[in-house]
A protein has these predicted regions:
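Mg2+-dependent prenyl diphosphate-binding active-site environment of isoprenoid biosynthetic enzymes
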Residues: 21-225, 231-267, 273-285
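N-terminal amphipathic/basic leader segments beginning at the initiator methionine
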Residues: 1-21
Length: 289
């Protein structure tokens, strides 16, 4: 077990923020808009997972570009979700949404740009892995192929894009339908985090299905927690694609803790548990009562 202190978790978040800050020099209004979107008060959970999985594997491989890719995908999805034609949100990450400040045209271009940059970062991380010592340099091509397949599936019409569609146009407000939205819209991007951290961190490719199970349990717990905390607001807005509103708060709480325990158990089985993952799990339980 790799022990990472809470301060190290904070240091990693600071490093991610520094990399994000320098990713788009403010040469024009588009880059300014992208910087505005990515430099909010986000918790950086998805890129953190990439870094933590790779570090726990102990191979000392650089996965920082893959970590940025996940934050780019995530931010791109938030920009699109916030648009008037979607969820019509006015606030995101404690400040006005991107389209409120820069207009819808620049918001759309920012979302497109972040998605393409995310794929470029994945390619760059593959090139970085080629420079590593053996056996990792020989794994780089397959790692990049796996990462690109995972990212395109999880962010595209088989993943988060379809999830947003089903969220906007729900067929039924039943537990099965809501679980499908969670699987497509939330779990997919977490799958990207765990898988990219694993393959670019030098993990055993034969364990990928179990790594995806990690994402499934973590992503479900993560979304259930959000739904529990958002129950009152979602009820007022008549947003019924909320699992806690459908099954009730207590059942949702029980499901949350079940998923979290499955996640922690599988972390240990894959030998990638760490003090930082434990800290993240503790943070997820905060404010739940």
């Amino acid at each position: 077990m790799v022990l990472l202190t809470k301060s190290k978790l904070a240091q990693k978040r600071e490093k991610i923020n520094a990399d994000l800050f320098s990713a788009f020099p403010k040469e024009n209004r588009l880059f300014e808009a992208i910087s505005y979107a990515i430099m909010g008060s986000g918790k950086r959970v998805r890129p953190l997972i990439v870094l933590l999985i790779a570090e726990a594997l102990g191979n000392k491989l650089d996965v920082s570009k893959a970590a940025l890719a996940l934050e780019f995908f995530h931010t791109a999805s938030l920009i699109a979700d916030d648009l008037p034609c979607m969820d019509n949100e006015e606030l995101r990450r404690d400040k006005p949404t991107l389209h409120k400040v820069y207009g819808e045209s620049i918001a759309l271009l920012s979302s497109y740009g972040l998605i393409s940059e995310a794929f470029r970062k994945i390619h760059e991380n593959g090139e970085e892995m080629k420079k590593a010592k053996e056996p990792f340099s020989s794994m780089a091509l397959e790692a990049t192929s796996i990462a690109l397949e995972c990212a395109s599936r999880c962010a595209g019409v088989q993943g988060a894009t379809l999830g947003q569609y089903l969220d906007l146009f729900p067929i039924k407000q039943e537990i099965e339908s809501i679980e499908k939205v969670i699987a497509l819209k939330t779990i997919t991007l977490f799958e990207g985090s765990f898988v990219l951290g694993w393959v670019f961190g030098g993990g055993d490719f034969t364990q990928l299905e179990r790594v995806k199970e990690l994402a499934k349990h973590f992503g479900m717990a993560f979304q259930i927690r959000d739904d529990i905390l958002d129950m009152e607001e979602d009820f007022k807005k008549k947003e019924h694609a909320n699992i806690a509103l459908v099954i009730g708060k207590q059942k949702a709480m029980n499901r949350f803790f079940q998923e979290l325990e499955k996640f922690k158990k599988l972390l240990k089985e894959l030998d990638v548990d760490s003090a930082s993952f434990e800290e993240i799990c503790k943070k997820l339980t905060n404010n739940l009562k």
